[in-house]
Amino acid sequence: MGKEPDNINMKKAITDPEILSTIAKLITKSISEDNIDKVAGPALGAVPIATAVSLESEIPLLMIRKEKKGYGTSKLIEGELNEGDDVIVVEDVTTTGGSLLKAIKAIQDNGGSVKRAFVVVDRQEGAIEAFDSEGVKLEPLITVDEFF
């Protein structure tokens, strides 16, 4: 195993159309047997991934803000989330999973159900276990050990 960086910068990957397309195809293939109503991603890093998956799968998109804005619609969730919607959540990188779990809680608090989440790179610092304890399966496309 090589030395892993303290910070994994996914911005280059999530702004590259070819890489985004590959990520979207992998996730879409994985959910093709599921009855998913919405694809969600927390701002900012996951929004391009969620958008790419939405376009590839033709499943409507939700964007989850970190906090409500004091202006405009002041919504935490942008997009139409209906009571009982099955939602998959995507993220670029997870460490402990805290920020993604916060986004999932926002979806659940607004009537949605989340059973699966996808992350491009898992840093292997407890996120999978944290998700398991919440009843959500976190599925990394790659782990930091595979990446570095």
Each language-model region and where it sits:
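PRPP-dependent phosphoribosyltransferase catalytic core
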Residues: K105-F148
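Structural detector of well-ordered beta-strand residues that form the stable sheet scaffold
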Residues: V39-A40, L62, K115, E139
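Active-site-facing substrate-recognition patch
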Residues: M1-N35
